[in-house]
Each structure stands twice: as C-alpha cells, then as structure tokens.
From Swiss-Prot:
Oligomeric form and interacting partners: Interacts with GyrB.
Cofactor list: Zn(2+)
Cofactor binding remark: Binds 1 zinc ion.
InterPro entries tied to this protein: DNA_gyrase_inhibitor_YacG (IPR005584), Znf_NHR/GATA (IPR013088)
Keywords, alphabetical: Metal-binding, Zinc
Gene, per the UniProt record: yacG
Name the record gives this protein: DNA gyrase inhibitor YacG
Chain positions recorded as Zn(2+) binding sites: C14, C17, C33, C37
Family under the similarity heading: Belongs to the DNA gyrase inhibitor YacG family.
Pfam families, sorted: YacG
One annotated GO biological process: regulation of DNA-templated transcription
Taxonomic source organism: Aliivibrio salmonicida (strain LFI1238)
GO MF assignments: DNA topoisomerase type II (double strand cut, ATP-hydrolyzing) inhibitor activity; zinc ion binding
Function: Inhibits all the catalytic activities of DNA gyrase by preventing its interaction with DNA. Acts by binding directly to the C-terminal domain of GyrB, which probably disrupts DNA binding by the gyrase.
Residues making up the signal peptide according to the UniProt record: none
C-alpha cells in the first residue's frame, strides 16, 4: 500500500532580498518575507524605478492636440 502524497510547501524567493518564503495563507506579506521588503518594493514602483514595458508615450509630434474637437 502506498502512502499518501505529502505535499511539500511551495517556496519562493522574496523579490527584494531573495530570502526563502513559504507560499501559504500564513505568509502575510507574500511574496515578500517582511513588511520592510514589501515597502521597499512599493517605493521602487512609486519612484518609477520599476515599470512594465508598454507603448512609448505620445509626443507633440504624434498629432495630439489640446484643442477640443
């Protein structure tokens, strides 16, 4: 008779400090290891040190006008 599969907890790396974090409901700040690492990451996004790649911003030469239609 085989034993039931005991699931190993999912372990991820904290995006800020690379410490190991158990991914479960008790990990309050997941994927971060702590509130400090969470706030460091938030600050980097707020300061625009991090961004998601997208289309370039429109410039004045793109035909944009502040004049109403």
């Amino acid at each position: 008779m085989s034993q039931p599969n005991s699931q190993q907890p999912t372990i991820v790396k904290c995006p800020t400090c690379q410490n190991k974090v158990v991914w479960n409901t008790e990990s309050e700040f997941r994927p971060f290891c702590s509130k400090k690492c969470q706030m460091i990451d938030f600050g980097e996004w707020a300061d625009e040190e991090k961004s998601i790649a997208g289309a370039p911003d429109m410039s004045d030469s793109d035909g944009w006008s502040s004049e109403p239609y």
